[in-house]
Amino acid sequence: QRALFSLENPTTLPKEGLPVKALNDALLSDVLFIEIRPGWQSDVPLHIVSIGCGDHVGFSSKIFVSAGENCHVDIVESHAGEYGSTYFSSCVSNIDIKAGARLGHYKLQNDTDTSTHLALTQTSIESDAVYDNFVMSVGGILSRNEVRSFIAASGVECCVNGAYLGTSNQ
């Protein structure tokens, strides 16, 4: 069975049933590629910051992560907005975790109270690898964080957690 995607051929993602991805593809404005070498380990997380600003604008980003065999790294994503601004944010993350790798992926979605945030995280996880995901959503009039994982072999640990803190008219 084929993984959801590959960095070598990112077009292998299915189009059906992925409306956030389809919208992201249509509006794509920024792409980030992160390749973590096999065996590389870090106690310091990689921090990706996305700041929305301006009124009635939209931006769309895509993140590709390839975690090499037996590497160990944490990635933190922070999404925030300029106070008072109203915008639309779409983010798709494609993460490929090779055999024996450990990847922590933690996201704080704290956009403005009048903004919309749609996100999709897709992972492909190989044998004896670990993927730990946590999403905290505290901002936005509307927010969606979808996580899909393809477990490609045995011995995989995949942990997906999240929390929403709704206030006012969210």
Regions found by a protein language model. Give the residues of each.
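Conserved beta-strand/loop scaffold segments within soluble protein domains that form the structured core
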Residues: 3-170
